[in-house]
């Protein structure tokens, strides 16, 4: 896992458009980022690596079990719906119970956004892999089917062959997205372009590892 200096959890609100100072209209995704709480600190001495454990999204008391309540009690916070880790260089820069807000990033920063893509269910070759369809007339019985699965010689299908199957619902990372605007009062971060996932789904924002 790559070591990052910071990171924040958020929720996808939706997409809109904003004008830049130059008058250009650009598409942006609105992310409700934070507030997140530092629940646990991990060090090389105790866990073998340096990281902070961050919680986001309040969970109703009756939906949390005793281990969950006990884990967050050390940080004096309520049970969290989402808990994720960020590997950091300096663990001592963070305190248990510390609040991480949208001010962690500023306009102009490059970020990587991680989310779970929308699930499409069982999909065929054309939708899932972008395959070309077959002839649609003159007696053809091959329209949207898979086609050849391989040669007669091996008499088997090799691993990695594009086939119909379940599509979407996977962890996707979109790199080098620009932060257009930050509204700390509303815990909002506007990111240029689209990000993976449905509305209200969990997103992870961290500094871009391939920033230009």
Curated annotation (Swiss-Prot):
GO terms for biological process: translation. Gene3D superfamilies: 3.30.160.810, Translation factors. Residues 128-146 have a biased composition (Basic residues). Keywords: Ribonucleoprotein, Ribosomal protein, RNA-binding, rRNA-binding. Pfam families: Ribosomal_L3. Disulfide bonds: none annotated. One of its GO terms (molecular function) is structural constituent of ribosome. One of its GO terms (cellular component) is cytosolic large ribosomal subunit. SUPFAM superfamilies: Translation proteins. Signal peptide: none annotated. Residues 128-164 are annotated as: Disordered. It comes from the Bacteria. Part of the 50S ribosomal subunit. Forms a cluster with proteins L14 and L19. HAMAP family: Ribosomal_uL3_B. NCBIfam families: L3_bact. Belongs to the universal ribosomal protein uL3 family. One of the primary rRNA binding proteins, it binds directly near the 3'-end of the 23S rRNA, where it nucleates assembly of the 50S subunit. This is Large ribosomal subunit protein uL3. It comes from Desulfitobacterium hafniense (strain Y51). The gene is rplC.
């Amino acid at each position: 896992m790559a070591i990052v200096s910071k990171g924040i959890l958020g929720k996808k609100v939706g997409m809109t458009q904003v004008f830049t100072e130059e008058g250009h209209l650009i598409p942006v995704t609105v992310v409700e980022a934070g507030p997140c709480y530092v629940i646990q600190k991990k060090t090389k001495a105790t866990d073998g690596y340096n990281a902070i454990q961050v919680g986001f999204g309040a969970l109703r008391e009756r939906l949390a079990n005793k281990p969950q309540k006990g884990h967050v009690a050390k940080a004096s916070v309520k049970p969290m719906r989402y808990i994720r880790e960020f590997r950091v260089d300096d663990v001592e820069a963070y305190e248990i119970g510390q609040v991480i807000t949208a001010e962690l990033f500023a306009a102009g920063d490059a970020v990587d956004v991680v989310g779970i893509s929308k699930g499409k269910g069982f999909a065929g070759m054309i939708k899932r892999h972008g395959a070309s369809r077959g002839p649609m007339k003159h007696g053809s019985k091959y329209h949207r089917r898979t086609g050849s699965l391989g040669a007669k010689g091996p008499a088997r299908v090799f691993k990695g062959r594009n086939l119909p199957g379940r599509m979407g619902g996977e962890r996707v990372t979109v790199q080098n997205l620009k932060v257009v605007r930050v509204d700390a009062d509303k815990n909002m971060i506007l990111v240029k372009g689209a990000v993976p996932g449905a509305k209200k789904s969990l997103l992870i924002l961290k500094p871009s590892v391939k920033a230009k």
